[in-house]
Amino acid sequence: MAKEESIEVEGEILEALPNAQFRVKLENGLEVLAHVSGKIRMHYIRILPGDKVKVQISPYDLSKGRITYRYK
């Protein structure tokens, strides 16, 4: 079985939740629950409410995602 491609969308952090999770409002208006990717966690990149981020979303569950980039 081939792995489905993930969807990459930009969004804005609404609130920080426990366990390095965030509520993100995407540019299409949806809100998703997103966690921080390993590279961002490894390099201690701080993510705060109001930051613009890039989120990868699985096509299987459109309510959860992974934050892969924080825009400067």
From Swiss-Prot:
Q: Where in the cell is it found?
A: Cytoplasm
Example GO CC term: the record gives: cytosol
PROSITE patterns assigned? S1_IF1_TYPE
Q: Which SUPFAM superfamilies match?
A: Nucleic acid-binding proteins (SSF50249)
CDD domains to which the protein is assigned, alphabetical = S1_IF1
Keywords attached to this Swiss-Prot or TrEMBL record, sorted alphabetically, are: Cytoplasm, Initiation factor, Protein biosynthesis, RNA-binding, rRNA-binding
User: Where is the S1-like domain positioned along the sequence?
Assistant: 1-72
Pfam family example for this protein? eIF-1a
NCBIfam families per the UniProt record, alphabetical: infA
Quaternary structure annotation from Swiss-Prot or TrEMBL: Component of the 30S ribosomal translation pre-initiation complex which assembles on the 30S ribosome in the order IF-2 and IF-3, IF-1 and N-formylmethionyl-tRNA(fMet); mRNA recruitment can occur at any time during PIC assembly.
Q: Report the family membership.
A: Belongs to the IF-1 family.
Q: Which PANTHER family match?
A: TRANSLATION INITIATION FACTOR IF-1, CHLOROPLASTIC (PTHR33370:SF1)
The protein's job, in short, is: One of the essential components for the initiation of protein synthesis. Stabilizes the binding of IF-2 and IF-3 on the 30S subunit to which N-formylmethionyl-tRNA(fMet) subsequently binds. Helps modulate mRNA selection, yielding the 30S pre-initiation complex (PIC). Upon addition of the 50S ribosomal subunit IF-1, IF-2 and IF-3 are released leaving the mature 70S translation initiation complex.
* Protein name per UniProt: Translation initiation factor IF-1
What organism is this sequence from?
A: Chlorobaculum tepidum (strain ATCC 49652 / DSM 12025 / NBRC 103806 / TLS)
Gene of this entry = infA
